[in-house]
Amino acid sequence: MPTIQQLVRKGRQAKASKTKTPALKGSPQRRGVCTRVYTTTPKKPNSALRKVARVRLTSGVEVTAYIPGVGHNLQEHSIVLVRGGRVKDLPGVRYKIIRGSLDTQGVRNRKQGRSRYGAKKEKS
């Protein structure tokens, strides 16, 4: 434990917080180009084929991003918008692709939670 005199001389060092989305470089979203679109399996105890894409961002970093929703139209060289947000059962996936923006289409026939999936309001 430091003495009062040591604290007067030096002071306490605030612990620097580590960012969870370093590739975004402080931006809320980043544009990028898909370099590879593929499926991968989640860790135990879950089982599925999760759709993911390798994306080269405008910041120059290549990241793995999750493609949310049912079905997608992404392929290599698609321009996408990436936001932060990890997928708990996919190790190393710390970003998500924003649906309904740039080359990514929204989810079809989506009735609830539409804004998250870029789905337009259906005409009744």
From Swiss-Prot:
Entries under Pfam families matching the protein: Ribosom_S12_S23
Keywords, ordered alphabetically: Methylation, Ribonucleoprotein, Ribosomal protein, RNA-binding, rRNA-binding, tRNA-binding
Q: Which ranges are annotated Basic residues under compositional bias? A: 9-18
* Annotated TM spans: none
Do you know which CDD domains this protein is assigned to?
Ribosomal_S12
Q: Name one GO cellular component term.
A: small ribosomal subunit
Task: State the residue spans of region: Disordered.
Answer: 1-32
Q: Which GO terms describe its biological process?
A: translation
Q: Which residues carry this modification: 3-methylthioaspartic acid?
A: D89
Alphabetized PROSITE patterns for the sequence: RIBOSOMAL_S12
Question: Care to name a GO molecular-function term for this sequence?
Answer: rRNA binding
**InterPro entries membership:** NA-bd_OB-fold, Ribosomal_uS12, Ribosomal_uS12_bac
Complex formation: Part of the 30S ribosomal subunit. Contacts proteins S8 and S17. May interact with IF1 in the 30S initiation complex.
Entry-linked HAMAP family: Ribosomal_uS12_B
Q: Which family does it belong to?
A: Belongs to the universal ribosomal protein uS12 family.
Q: Which NCBIfam families match?
A: rpsL_bact (TIGR00981)
Give the function comment from the record.
Answer: With S4 and S5 plays an important role in translational accuracy.
Q: What is this protein called?
A: Small ribosomal subunit protein uS12
The uppermost taxa in this organism's lineage are: Bacteria, Bacillati, Actinomycetota, Actinomycetes, Acidothermales
